[in-house]
């Protein structure tokens, strides 16, 4: 069955901002200052997705660290193209077992293309029970809602359904310092090369709409 490309509505994105506000209010009520560690593996697309995750977290009241031991939330933003990157992710998940024991309230998240693989999500579900949240690239725009579910229910959340391809514009980003900014203008691929798994995870090609604020990234480099 052919899967359709779906443009995420403004109302749906506004709902995610409501979940960001809920998370921020929760930590404010606890007089806590949440810290997140976002560890990105793989290509420039993953770097761009990592900056979106950080943008949504910043709007939820988080600051950032590179040390998972200091973090209340650890995100492994994964790549499924190279086996070496996959092995590193599982190695890091093993290490995070110890940080979770030291800080039982820490939330650990696995996302990206690797998380979309059924064998990986099943392995995590069975063997890495300290991982709280797993979601694929199509659910990235719903990250605030998924994270809120974890905080509210204290149960593990898996969002790796083989959904239609989504196009979500206007997601906040936190960019690293410097003169480079990754702006995704298209997703997916229509060429099913025998050696590549990208079309199976990111689905068919879909592009940003013309003349939107998303393109402003090309004109806003600051020196």
What do the PLM-derived regions correspond to, one by one?
Residues 1-223:
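Proteins enriched for Cys/Gly/acidic motifs involved in redox and nucleic-acid/cofactor modification
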């Amino acid at each position: 069955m052919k899967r359709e490309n779906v443009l995420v509505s403004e109302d749906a994105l506004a709902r995610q901002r409501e979940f960001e506000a809920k998370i921020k209010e929760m930590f404010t009520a606890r007089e806590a200052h949440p810290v997140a560690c976002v560890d990105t593996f793989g290509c420039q697309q993953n770097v761009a997705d990592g900056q979106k995750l950080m943008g949504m977290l910043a709007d939820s009241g988080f600051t950032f660290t590179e040390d998972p031991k200091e973090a209340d939330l650890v995100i492994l933003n994964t790549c499924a193209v190279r086996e070496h990157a996959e092995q590193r992710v599982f190695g890091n998940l093993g290490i995070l077992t110890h940080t979770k024991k030291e800080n039982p309230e820490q939330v650990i998240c696995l996302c990206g293309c690797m998380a979309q693989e059924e064998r990986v999500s099943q392995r995590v579900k069975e063997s890495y029970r300290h991982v709280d949240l797993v979601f694929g690239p199509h659910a990235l725009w719903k990250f605030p809602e998924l994270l809120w579910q974890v905080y509210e229910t204290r149960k593990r959340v898996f969002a790796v359904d083989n959904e239609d391809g989504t196009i979500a514009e206007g997601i906040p980003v936190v960019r690293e310092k410097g003169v480079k900014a990754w702006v995704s203008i298209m997703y997916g691929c229509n060429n099913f090369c025998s050696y590549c798994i990208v079309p199976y995870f990111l689905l068919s090609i879909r592009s940003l709409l013309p003349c939107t604020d998303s393109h402003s990234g090309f004109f806003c480099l600051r020196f």
